UniProtKB/Swiss-Prot annotation:
One of its GO terms (cellular component) is membrane. It holds the Pfam family Hydrophob_seed. Residues 30-53 are annotated as: Disordered. Residues 38-48 have a biased composition (Pro residues). This is 14 kDa proline-rich protein DC2.15. InterPro entries: Bifun_inhib/LTP/seed_sf, Bifunc_inhib/LTP/seed_store, Hydrophob_seed_dom, Plant_LTP/defense-related. Induction: By the removal of auxins. The chain crosses the membrane at residues 88-104. It is a single-pass membrane protein. SMART domains: AAI (SM00499). Its main location: membrane. PANTHER family: PTHR31731.
Amino acid sequence: MGSKNSASVALFFTLNILFFALVSSTEKCPDPYKPKPKPTPKPTPTPYPSAGKCPRDALKLGVCADVLNLVHNVVIGSPPTLPCCSLLEGLVNLEAAVCLCTAIKANILGKNLNLPIALSLVLNNCGKQVPNGFECT
């Protein structure tokens, strides 16, 4: 009876080990590594420079003095003054403002002018606007 008893105990332990191995092998596998996406940096807004660079030769902007001389004779609906506006053509408002600001500050236009008013007059005559926040100092 001893061998029958030991055989059944051995069978019991063998089956226990087998079932334990089967049950523990069905554990859920961990998820594969997924790298976190890098956050995109927010672009820094560029402030309006009061002293930027003019893509045109500021000396050529002397022809814009005619616009300031003739501004009191301007008729509404008349075409813009050609020599000055053709120099500013193709420039965005900020570039045109920087160019004229440089010319006015360097006294290229030949007069002591009120900066904001002169700048606004020439730009408006050529169909451009002074950018918000732009200061010609």
